[in-house]
């Protein structure tokens, strides 16, 4: 609804991270996307798809420990309907090990050019993933948004869409009239967004 001219490709990812990365890298080669957006585990994968503009939303860069700390072992129900019809997955210690090994590959090819291509959006009330500081060690374009781990429509409209629009404008050589307001103006004493940020 927000971007009627955009073609969105959102395949089901294999549960095993090596298979997921292979699928994603092949998609990048065949589809040549203008922008890749990934949330949570998808944000972790997105960071490693070098050479393309990317937005990592609440990226799970510590997926192995996130699984154990958030009590995600055993049977888990998918929160979104999958194209393959699968409803659940069994998370084992072996799978957690695979995720730990995959996350060790994050940030392996960060360059000054890559830093300009990657944006991080982090929910200020995310109870699951806390990787803002880790992301900021490697990339400078990171913000907190008012929200939790899952993206809701309000967060998409107020935070994700402006970043998408900014990237699209940059890619197309468009320049919009802009008034810049310091983030300090819209943050409380703890650096969290004030309610006025949503108005």
Regions found by a protein language model. Name each.
Residues 1-30, 149:
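Active-site catalytic motif of lipid deacylating hydrolases and related acyltransferases
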Residues 15, 39, 121-125:
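Structural motif
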Residues 37-47:
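Gly/Ala-rich beta-loop-alpha elbow adjacent to hydrolase catalytic centers
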Residues 172-199:
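Eukaryotic N-terminal low-complexity, Ser/Thr- and Lys/Arg-rich leader segments
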Residues 1, 46, 131-135:
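Short, highly selective alpha-helical patches that border small-molecule cofactor pockets
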Residues 47-53:
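Glycosyltransferases and closely related glycan-assembly transferases
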Residues 53-182:
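The alpha/beta-hydrolase serine catalytic core
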């Amino acid at each position: 609804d927000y971007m009627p001219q955009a073609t969105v490709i959102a395949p089901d990812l294999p549960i095993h991270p090596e298979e997921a990365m292979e699928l994603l890298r092949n998609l990048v080669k065949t589809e040549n996307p203008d922008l890749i957006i990934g949330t949570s585990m998808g944000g972790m994968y997105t960071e490693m798809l070098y050479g393309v503009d990317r937005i990592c939303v609440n990226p799970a860069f510590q997926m192995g420990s996130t699984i154990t700390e958030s009590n995600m072992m055993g049977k888990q129900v998918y929160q979104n309907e999958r194209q393959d019809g699968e409803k659940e997955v069994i998370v084992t210690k072996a799978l957690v090990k695979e995720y730990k090994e995959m996350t060790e590959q994050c940030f392996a090819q960060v360059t000054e050019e890559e830093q300009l291509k990657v944006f991080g959006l982090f929910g200020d009330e995310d109870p699951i993933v806390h990787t803002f500081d880790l992301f900021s060690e490697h990339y400078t374009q990171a913000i907190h948004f008012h929200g939790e781990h899952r993206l809701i429509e309000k967060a998409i409209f107020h935070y994700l869409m402006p970043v998408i629009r900014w990237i699209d404008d940059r890619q197309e050589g468009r320049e919009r009239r802009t008034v810049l307001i310091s983030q300090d103006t819209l943050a409380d004493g703890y650096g969290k967004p004030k309610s006025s940020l949503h108005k």
